[in-house]
Amino acid sequence: MPEDAIGQQVPPEQEAAGAEPTSAARERHATLSLELTEHQYRYYVLDAPTISDAEFDERLRELAALEAEFPALRTPDSPTQRVGGAFSTDFTPVAHAERMMSLDNAFTDEELDAWAERVERDAGGPVPYLCELKVDGLAINLTYERGRLVRAATRGDGRTGEDVTANVRSIRDVPAELAPSAEFPEIPGLLEVRGEIYFPIAGFADLNAGLVEQGKAPFANPRNAAAGSLRQKDPRITASRPLRLVVHGIGARQGWQPSTQSESYAALRAWGLPTSDRWRVVPDLAGVAEYIAHYATHRHDVEHEIDGVVVKVDPVSIQGRLGSTSRAPRWAIAFKYPPEEVNTRLLDIDVNVGRTGRVTPFAVLEPVRVAGSTVALATLHNAREVRRKGVLIGDTVVIRKAGDVIPEVLGPVVELRPPDARSFVMPSTCPCCGTPLAPAKEGDVDIRCPNTRSCPAQLRERVFHLAGRGAFDIEVLGYKGAAALLDAQIITDEGDLFALDAAQLTRSPFFVNKDGSLGSNAVKLLDNLTVAKERELWRVLVALSIRHVGPTAAQALARHFRSIEAIDQAGEEELSAVDGVGPTIAASVREWFAVAWHREVVRKWAEAGVRMTEEAVDEGPRPLEGMTVVVTGTLAGFSRDQAAEAIQSRGGKVTGSVSKKTAFVVVGENPGTKADKAASLKVPVLDEEGFRVLLDAGPDAAREVARVED
C-alpha cells in the first residue's frame, strides 16, 4: 500500500495561511478521511484491502490538496499526517526505539526534480544519491541487542508496532545472531534494522492454489500474501510459507555511526543480513533518472513486486542536516511508477479456440485503465488455473498489465464477493463447431477441439497465422481478411489460399467496392500471394502450423533437408538428430505429416506454385557452428529477428537463457537479468560493436573485445 505521505511538502510559514474552508470542502474532507482510515485499517490490520494502491494514492492526494488549500482542515489525526495506523489487533503492541517514518512520494519527474532542488539547496550543492527498489511488501523492524535478535515488530503507526518476533524467527533470511566480519568487526550493542518482508512472485500462484484446495480464501496479490502469512497466530503457518526479507535501513543504534547509507548496507550484509543486490549510488539526478528508467522497463525481472524506486541522500551527515517532517525524512523520497495493478469486476468468463485447437478461458472485465491502456479482457490460461486462482464470476478481481504483456487476473478480492457470484464451468463442446472437447493426450492440462480441419475458429486463426511476418508475410490478410474469406466460404481450408482468383474474391464485401468491382484489398491480396509463393522453405514450414515449429526449428529443418518432401520422408530419429530440433519437435513433425488432410494442404500449395525446396547454395563459412549465443536488450542496428538470423546463418544457435555453455551474451540497451547472469557465470559479454566483430571476424576476434567479469 502507499506510504501514507504526499509528494508535496508544505513550508511551515504557509501552515497558517489559506482561506476559510467551504462547507463542501469540509464535507469532502470528512468523507475522504473516513474512507482512508477504513482502508488503512483493512490494509494494515485485516491484510484485506478492497481498493488498489493507485486508488488509495489518488484519494490521499485529493485529501492533501484540500488541506493545502484550506490548512484549517489539517489535524494531527488526518490520514495525511499518520504513518500506517494505530489500530487494535491480536498482537502485543511494542514501541520502536526510534520512530519508523514514512516516505514522501513523487509521481512525476517534475515532483522528483522539485524534491532534489530543495535537497541540493539546503545541502549547499549537489549530493550523491542512493537508489534502490521500493519493495511492495510488509515493513518490519528488527531489534538486535549485542548481536542477538530480541524483537521483530511491524511498523504500526511508526511509534508502536505489533510484536511478531516468533513468526519472524521462522523466516530463513532473518539471522538469529549477527556475525562480525573482517571489515566490520564491531557489532553495535543496540541495532534496529528496517526492512521489508515479501512473498516471492514465483510462489504466489501455488500458495493460492493450495488455499483454494483447502476451501480457504485466496490472496489478491503477493503483498497481501506476505502480510497475511506473517500475521498468523500460529508461527508454524508462517514457517510453511516462503517469505523473504530485504533490509534497507537502520533505526536506533549504539556504538556505530556509518558515514553513508551505502556503508550501512555494506555493514548489514557483512553481518549476515540480506540487503538488495540492486541498489546503486549515483553522483547526480541524471543518474537517478537513468536508474528509474531502467527499472521502469525491467521491474518484472525482479523476484518480488516493486511499485517504484526509493531515492536517498547517501551521506549521513547531510541526512542529519536536512532532517525530517512529522512523518517523513526530507532526505529521501519514493518515486512511484504508474500502477500496473488495479481492481475491477469480473463480468464473465468466456473461452477462445486457438489455431491448434486449444480452448482457453479468458476474463471479460468491466473496462478499466491500467498501464496506459484500457483493459476489458485478461487471460486465465486454462480451467485448472481458474480453479487455482479461486475467482468466481461477479468477483472484484486484481488484474495486472505489464507493458505489452497480455493482462492477467491475479486473484479475487474475497471481501467484496457478491452473494450471486458463480463458478466458471468449462464447456464440454467447442463453442464454434460443437465438437466434443478432449485433451490431446491423457494427462494434458489443456483441452482441445479435435475438429482441426473444419472448426471455423481454428481455421481463421491458422490463416491469420500463415499471413504473419514470421511466415508468408501477406500484408492484406489480417484478422478481418481471414474472417472475410471464411465467412463468404471462399476457401474451405488454408490449402485453397494460393489458388484464389479475382472472381472468387468478389463473393466477399470485404474485397469489392460499392459498385461491385474488385477492391484494392483484393488486388493487393492477389499480388501478395504471388510474391509469397517464392518465400523461403522455412517460412512455409512455419505457415503450416506444426506444433512447436517456430522460426528457429523451421530454419534448422530447411537447412538440413532442403525440401518438404525430404522432411516428410525423414524418420523421427533422423529429425531429432538435427541441431535445434530435438525429440519433442521431431515427434510433432511426424504427427503432423501423418494426417492426410495436412499432406493435402502441402499438395495444393505445391500445385499452386508455392516453393517447396531450398536451393542448394554455398553457405560459406559457419564460424559459429556449435556455439550458443544469447541476445538481450535493444540493438540499434538489428531487430531481434535479424540478430537471430545473423547468428543462425553462421551456424550458431540462439537461446533465451544463459548457462555455462553459452559462448557469448550480446547486450544492447536496457538489458535484462541475462546480463547479470552472464557476469556471474563469467560468460563473455559483447556490446553491439563487439557483436559485429563476432559476425564479421569470428569468435576468436570477438573474445579479444568481449568483457568478462573478474
UniProtKB/Swiss-Prot annotation:
Keyword Membrane: no
Protein residues bound to Zn(2+): C430, C433, C449, C455
Catalytic activity line of the entry: NAD(+) + (deoxyribonucleotide)n-3'-hydroxyl + 5'-phospho-(deoxyribonucleotide)m = (deoxyribonucleotide)n+m + AMP + beta-nicotinamide D-nucleotide
Occurrences of domain BRCT (ranges): 619-708
Region annotation (Disordered) ranges: 1-26
Keyword hit for GTP-binding: no
GO CC aspect terms: cytosol
Function statement: DNA ligase that catalyzes the formation of phosphodiester linkages between 5'-phosphoryl and 3'-hydroxyl groups in double-stranded DNA using NAD as a coenzyme and as the energy source for the reaction. It is essential for DNA replication and repair of damaged DNA.
Family: Belongs to the NAD-dependent DNA ligase family. LigA subfamily.
Protein name: DNA ligase
